[in-house]
Amino acid sequence: MRYTSLFTAVTAALASTAAAVGVSGAAEGFAKGVTGGGNASPVYPKTNDELVSYLGDSQARVIVLTKTFDFRGTEGTTSGTGCAPWGTNAKCQLAINQNSWCDNYQPNAPKVSVSYDNAGVLGITVNSNKSLIGQGSAGVIKGKGLRIVSGAKNVIIQNIAITDINPKYVWGGDAITINNADLVWIDHVTTARIGRQHIVLGTQADNRITISNCYIDGVTDYSATCNGYHYWGIYLDGSNDMVTMKGNYIYHTSGRSPKVQGNTLLHAVNNYWYDNAGHAFEIGSGAYVVAEGNVFQNVKAVAESPISGKLFSSPDASTNKVCSSYLGHTCQINGFGSSGAFSQADTDILSKFKGKNIASAAAYNTVVSSVTANAGNGKL
């Protein structure tokens, strides 16, 4: 009788643990309603090949990472001639001559020898209806990013780190690429030591995207600004995109943090930018940006000049009241410390937000403690 009771208790405990494995919380903002792999039984890849297979097949899946998956060296290396557009100082990034980029766009740059890891150049394909989640702080992908493209939809990436993708080389690879997709939630993801973009949304329609609680770590040995600050942070360039950025920690970058253009509606709320040696926002034609409740600390230029797109920077309490008719709340002012100016009130863009799923906004004075405690993997 005791053995039966013990067996029953153990079985129940295991079942409870299994049932608890899954996505934590729910997406706010434009990707609200995303379910990823839903209630699919979790799978635990043990090898790189298993991980690639689970992410790329046609089944709804909850994929749990319990270890580091290191792709470096798995697809060989390529050596050749690249270029040094930013100089030959040991701290400068070099460029791979991808699609003759050096020849066509940097013909006067010094030619240099390059040797890069092939695995990093193109990320792992992620198909529709997937949840990729890390267990604790153990879920890490090294040397290769993720690609959510070609019509993929309903995808959740949560609580993992993506690191060490050819950091010396521009065109060496991106951490997360989204292009021609819909309903994608990137949450509690750490990216570090990346050759090109930490997160990039391509020129096709990427539709409804939420990027939340992520840690964009720009500390690097090589950068396009030759100073240890990564330049290629976040690039939002889709033709019909709605992007929520909330609760992210964007640290030690020098540009494109984010660059916004194409036809992109961006709600940037309660993010923390710290220690930027160049510029954070780059707002190009076709960008419609509402920024509220953020903190900019030691950011040389909060927005690169000129601003070609549209911006509502939530400049003051009186002006911010207009938000309530469109976003459902009064916009929160941003906080600044040793940072450049950021004040523009293109109120005509607010109507574009009306009727959409809009993330809530807290006062900026809560942001630093909240973001530093919660952003990145291992902090669920």
Curated annotation (Swiss-Prot):
Kindly list the GO CC terms recorded for this protein: extracellular region
As for subcellular location, the record says: Secreted
Its recorded reaction(s) are:
Eliminative cleavage of (1->4)-alpha-D-galacturonan methyl ester to give oligosaccharides with 4-deoxy-6-O-methyl-alpha-D-galact-4-enuronosyl groups at their non-reducing ends
**Catalytic residues identified in the record:** R256
Family under the similarity heading = Belongs to the polysaccharide lyase 1 family.
Q: Which keywords annotate this record?
A: Carbohydrate metabolism, Cell wall biogenesis/degradation, Disulfide bond, Glycoprotein, Lyase, Polysaccharide degradation, Secreted, Signal
Q: Mind telling me what this protein is named?
A: Probable pectin lyase A
Q: Name one GO molecular function term.
A: pectate lyase activity
GO biological-process terms attached to the record: cell wall organization; pectin catabolic process
Glycosylated residues: list them: N129
Location, primary (coarse class): secreted
Superkingdom of source: Eukaryota
Which SMART domains does this chain map to? Amb_all
From the record, give the cysteines joined by S-S bonds: C83-C102, C92-C226, C323-C331
Q: So which residues are the signal peptide here?
A: 1-20
This molecule's function is given as: Pectinolytic enzymes consist of four classes of enzymes: pectin lyase, polygalacturonase, pectin methylesterase and rhamnogalacturonase. Among pectinolytic enzymes, pectin lyase is the most important in depolymerization of pectin, since it cleaves internal glycosidic bonds of highly methylated pectins.
What PANTHER family does this protein map onto?
A: PECTATE LYASE 18-RELATED, PECTIN LYASE A-RELATED
Its EC number is 4.2.2.10
